[in-house]
Amino acid sequence: RKDLETSLRTLETDYIDIYQFHNPAFCPKPGGEDGLYDAALEAKKQGKIRHISITNHRLAVAQEAIDSGLYASLQFPFSYLAGEQELALVEGCRTHGMGFIAMKGMAGGLLRDGLTAAAWMAVQENVVPIWGVQRESELDQFLQCIREGAELTDERRATIERDRRELCGEFCRGCGFCM
């Protein structure tokens, strides 16, 4: 509650559209000992937040959040290096009427071609990316996408396949979660 009030005051607003539990080790639920979900639900009833959402880096917690039906959206690491499990999360969100917010769309800086990443992300149904920019060149590429668009061409598909062959598996997304 205190964090929410601080956010409202700092943002100089009466409400927050999407209030996210950021990377909890568990899936907050009504009646939980932690009181997190109950506090968010009360704030929603008071009109201080519009949607309760969650971010996570753990597949099990993310899946539990989807299955719970309690959340408006899930924010999770997602790039064109995503495997079957991550793709299943996207589909789970879609079928449960939840939004999917992709973080780490450049795989924590591992990917270098922002135009290809943006073109791939644009064809993913029910996915909205939050682009973390680590280099000025990435910003330039994303701004180019806004101006010109980015089509998923055969050349970009080949880049994706090459990167998947070379980079997939256990790789660091640069999120610092393991620290």
Regions inferred by a protein language model and the residue ranges of each:
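Glycine/proline-rich, positively charged
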Residues: 1-101, 106-109
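Structured C-terminal cap/extension of enzyme domains
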Residues: 88-102, 106-179
